[in-house]
Each structure stands twice: as structure tokens, then as C-alpha cells.
Amino acid sequence: MELHFGSCLSGCLALLVLLPSLSLAQYEGWPYQLQYPEYFQQPAPEHHQRQVPSDVVKIQVRLAGQKRKHNEGRVEVYYEGQWGTVCDDDFSIHAAHVVCRQVGYVEAKSWAASSSYGPGEGPIWLDNIYCTGKESTLASCSSNGWGVTDCKHTEDVGVVCSEKRIPGFKFDNSLINQIESLNIQVEDIRIRPILSAFRHRKPVTEGYVEVKEGKAWKQICNKHWTAKNSHVVCGMFGFPAEKTYNPKAYKTFASRRKLRYWKFSMNCTGTEAHISSCKLGPSVTRDPVKNATCENGQPAVVSCVPSQIFSPDGPSRFRKAYKPEQPLVRLRGGAQVGEGRVEVLKNGEWGTICDDKWDLVSASVVCRELGFGTAKEAITGSRLGQGIGPIHLNEVQCTGTEKSIIDCKFNTESQGCNHEEDAGVRCNIPIMGFQKKVRLNGGRNPYEGRVEVLTERNGSLVWGTVCGQNWGIVEAMVVCRQLGLGFASNAFQETWYWHGNIFANNVVMSGVKCSGTELSLAHCRHDEEVACPEGGVRFGAGVACSETAPDLVLNAEIVQQTAYLEDRPMSLLQCAMEENCLSASAVHTDPTRGHRRLLRFSSQIHNNGQSDFRPKNGRHAWIWHDCHRHYHSMEVFTYYDLLSLNGTKVAEGHKASFCLEDTECEGDIQKSYECANFGEQGITMGCWDMYRHDIDCQWIDITDVPPGDYLFQVVINPNYEVPESDFSNNIMKCRSRYDGYRIWMYNCHVGGAFSEETEQKFEHFSGLLNNQLSVQ
């Protein structure tokens, strides 16, 4: 089996002129397309690479800077042997178009003044630059002259280019003759398994390193090949490390084959995220007809070490994602394996990383530490959802040689940072082939449909359906992840309205139960013998996937601060009785002179995810609550429980049914949902819903609870009715002590906030906070 990276579209190798110190956001296959939308700027950029007039000074242009994507950055120009910047004075969108075309993009989307991507270094080559937009190079635009400026680097200009590339674009490296300073962008590279022991393995871990040049795959001569080169190649394909291999078998194979060698060699330091960041090594020798040869050498071979999660030794290894006993770093909120918000463990508490100076090198250290390859993207701006708790690290700067992110240089001060700047990663992971073993059929778009899986039956591979009985959102999440389609937005137990493949109507999998961490549906628990009484044509499992999902988190501090006891007369609890917010013994309480003891508290539920939280049921299924005078869209939105220390429920009578709305929002975010006037219900991303301690049913009835030590627990979205990017933080726990008159709440925290060791100590913590008893 062969591993591919990108696609060779220009028929040759493209060379990218960049220095190793540049922070590159990602290296993925360029999605060249033949058609592009109309341009809103005039003159309209043309969709081909323009030739530079012979009488114009030759320059190189690149995009650089921090906190950027691959198609944006500070404009830097290579002139007279030195890189410099461009001042933002008189810069325009027309000049930005010229810059973007010069680095291979079809147009500019915008430009940024005042060193938005950080101040550069060296000379400021151009100032007061004026372009019409038709120029083929920035050197053709008028300016004050080379190096004539009154600007400072705080005025360095940046551009944001369209992500669409110019078809067949090739970087011109003729200006720079110092070959060791070149970086190389390979359009196509693969690990080709040679030995029979590796040909049918998933993932492919060993073989020739080959580059596609034109229509031919070519080997790389091993005369200048190093272990550092292997380290980078393995990282590209999702492996954290490389190992030695047996060269004798490959030497025998090479002697029997006619080989075609690539004309270049490469020189990596081992810290690069991709070989396109490596320097170009010495050219290989040529034979009389100018073909590249490898005198006294043979093709370069890599042998990579997969982490346990991707080990090919047996399917039992894939039951759950690999998790060490005490990890120091983890990923949260990502849709795919190997992506998420980066969180680190410090003093027993998990916290996030501020994205200041966050780059691909630091992200790669995280990825390798977790058992993946290098990073293909360093994510900034909490694009994978906001974390909670402390921000442990800021201004992280790794060299790429570190074994752990905590070994890197960083600033422990997080002044000026907030969770809107949480850093994340997308890591390279091995190609396992799981995506080819499941498909969606019959849906209205590629993101939905009946689930069909490929299984072995009587020695043959056949497609079939999955029984929809007990099919839920957790199982749907695994399918969407396996297909690379993000999160599940819906799980369907009936799919009669979707006409799947008629040759896949037989049920081949039933009783599926997933934990949510599996890499594929086949790794979930399921029946050995298929049992689906209702059949799979009408009751086949289905899913709808989405690129984003909400993430609800309860503010534990608010709960701890607002908890108190109230003895409330039964005469004021008639609505609560009707809504079953009191324990069963309340029916025997004197309605005129009796009272109930209520544990009251406020709940502030935040949506820290990437999309709005919407109730599963449509308006037609909402229930009118006469006492509250509004509709409740979710009958079971939360559980409020008081538990004994062994987990037994000791109290009943609490609020479960909810109306969902935006009480407050962060910054400039606008409220979208309200309960009044039969309004739309939900919680907007970046907003929160506040249930104050003084509203009906916002309590637990503890009238019958004896004094003692207890666990207070709140569970949001307990039945997983609405999909979220992270269900682990839906639980909030507190230790509580009740002496018959007062109650103390302490150590309130959401699930996953602390290490496993700290969580175990939680049961035995003796600290107390005093909460007073109020009597009405």
C-alpha cells in the first residue's frame, strides 16, 4: 500500500523560497481548481502566472509572521541578498493583489497595516508603494525607491490572500544561488512499501521515500540521507519517531530493479514539520544522458514507529484511543483524532495555552508527545472552542527537539490573555483506511445518510446496514469522525426515507455501543451474531454530520457561591408540586402550615463551543408550563442530585425541564434566543443561560435528608439528546456537608478539570466554606 501527500498538478516539483525560521501554518495538498468566482476589485487578477519583464529588478516575495494561516502574513521582499519588509503607507488592495499572485494565490482578500503579523527585521525595502493591480511583480510598482523610507517596523504591511492557488504555479528560485538556504515544497511524496511484510499492513510504516516528478515516482538517493530526514518524513505521515531497518533486504531488491532517482537531496535538522521546510542538499550525480544517479548508494528508506493507538499488531489495540496513566498534555474539543484545544496539567489542574507566539514547531512538539506525527496546523483564536480554568502557558517557544511541551521556553504570566486566545493543533496521523469501511447513502448531501459498513461475510467483503435499535449520538459521533466529516449533529434510528444502496439492505451489524473514543465503528462493542428483529431497510441507523458543535459548561464557582438552604411554606409551592419539583413525601405535608427544606443555588450554563446549542425537539413538541408561563423545549436538560459518598441518590425533587435562552453574552455577541412570546430557544455560542437561585424548582428538596457528608452533582444534557464537542465537562460536582441546619459547599468543579489523582483526593478533602440557612 502507498501513502500519498497532496497531488502533483504542475507536472514538476515546486520549490518554495522560505527560511527555516518562518512559522508556516500548514502544508496540505493545494486544492487547485479550474474555475473561480468573479472578483470584486478592479482590475481583476488573472488566473495564470505572469512573466516578469526582463528590464524589471528581480525580487522574491514571501509571507511571514506569527499567528497566521498559510495564505496570509507579513509581506517580505528579497532584494540585493537580504530579506526586508514593506511599509503600509499608501498600500492598497491593488498592491495586495500583486503580492498574492507573486506567491501563488489568485487574488488578495484584504491587507493589514501596523505590523498586524508582528514587526519584521532588516531593511524596509519599499515605502509609499503604488500599484495598479496589473503588475506581475511588486518591483514594477512605483515607490520612493529601494530602501528609501521614513517608516519603522511597527508599520510593516501584511496581506490576506484567497486560499485558491494559481493552477500550475511554480516558485522562481533563480534569484537565490545559496542552495543551502532553500526550502522545498514537494507536491507529492509517499512511503512505498517494498518488502512483502509491509505491503498489506495498515498503516504503512516502512519503505522507499519517493517523490513524484512529472508523472513518474522517483526514489531519493541515500548518499546524503540522514536519520533527521527520516524523522521529518515519519512525522509527516503521522508517526512520532523513526527506527533503524535491515538494509540488506533493500540492497538485494535495489540490485534487481531499474531505479529512477530524484535529482535533489535534502538536509533536514529534524525539527521541521514537513520536508518543505528542510534545506536543499547537494545535487546528485548525473549519467551521460543527464539522468540522476546514486553512485555507490541505493534508495533512501524510512522505518517509522507508530504509537500504540495506531499499532498494526491487532484490532484489540484499537478499542480506545491510547491514553497514558498520567498525561501532561491532552487535546479537547476536536472533531477528529489528533486535533483539539491543547491543555496541559500543572499542579493537578488542567489549563490551556495562550496562542501568543504559537507556531507549527511548538504544535509539533505537542503532537509527537501525544503519539501523533508533526503538526499540520497550529490553531489560534480558540477556533476549537474555549477552555475553562487557568491559562497555564503563554508565549510558548519550542526548538522542536523537546520531548514535551513543558520542556519548551514559555512565560507563566498570562496577562492580556483570555480563553478567546486558546491554542490548538491539528496533527498528522497515519492513514489507516478506516474511512473506506463506512459510507453514507441516500442523504440530501454528503454529510448525511444511512450508515453502511463494509464487513466480511463468508470470506467476501460485503456492504450492509447497521441496526438502528439503541443507536445514539455517541455512535453517530464515531461514524462522522471515521468519515472525516466532523461531529454528529443527529443520530437516526429510522432511515426509511433515505434510499440507500439496494445491494446493502442486509443488516450486518447490531447492538452497537460506543464509548466515543473509538477510531472506527468496528472497534465499538457489537453483537457477535446479528440480531435486528425490525430489519435494516426501515430501521437502519443513520447520521447527519456537522463541522462544528456546541459545548455546554456549568460555572462551578457560581454554584458554590450561591448555594444556601431555605425553609419554604407549602402554600408557596403549588406550582412546584404540579411540576414534580418536590420529593414524594411532599404529598403528606400540611399545605397550610408545613414547609419543605430546599437546597437552592444558581446555575450559569455557558456555551463554549463552535456553534449554537439548539434543543432537539422542534416547536411542535415543546411543552407549555402554566406556572412559568412559557414553553419548555427540553424536558430533561439537567439532573440535580444529592448523592451519598458511595454514589447512592439520597434526595429527589428538582428542576429538570428547561426553557433555553441567552441571558448574557460575551463582548459584542448578540443575543439570539429568548423564552418570552414563544421565541426561538437555545444558547448562542459565546453566551450563557442563567437560572437564578430564586426561581421555581431551581433547587433540590432535602427535607428528608439526614445530616452527613454528601456529593452534590449537576449533569447537563444527561441523555446526550443534543450533540456536543465535549461531553466530559457536562458534569459538575461539589463536596457538601449538612448538619441539619446549615449546608457547606466546597471543591466545586466540572468534569475533567483536575488530574485523576486529584479527583480521587476530592472525596476526602476536609476544607469547608460556610453557607447560611435562611428561613422564609
Curated annotation (Swiss-Prot):
Catalytic activity: L-lysyl-[protein] + O2 + H2O = (S)-2-amino-6-oxohexanoyl-[protein] + H2O2 + NH4(+)
Domain SRCR: from-to ranges: 61-162, 191-305, 329-428, 438-546
Gene Ontology terms: cellular component: basement membrane; chromatin; collagen-containing extracellular matrix; endoplasmic reticulum; extracellular space; membrane; nucleoplasm; nucleus
Induction: Strongly induced in hypoxia.
Enzyme class label: oxidoreductase
Keyword check for Transmembrane helix: no
Record PROSITE patterns: LYSYL_OXIDASE, SRCR_1, SRCR_2
Binding site for Ca(2+): D551, L552, E724, D726, N729, N730
Presence of keyword Disulfide bond: yes
Cofactor(s), names only, from the UniProt record: Cu cation; lysine tyrosylquinone residue
Modified how: The lysine tyrosylquinone cross-link (LTQ) is generated by condensation of the epsilon-amino group of a lysine with a topaquinone produced by oxidation of tyrosine. N-glycosylated. N-glycosylation on Asn-458 and Asn-646 may be essential for proper folding and secretion; may be composed of a fucosylated carbohydrates attached to a trimannose N-linked glycan core.
Quaternary state and interactors: Component of some chromatin repressor complex. Interacts with SNAI1. Interacts with TAF10. Interacts with HSPA5. Interacts with EFEMP2.
Family named by the database record: Belongs to the lysyl oxidase family.
Name of this chain's protein: Lysyl oxidase homolog 2
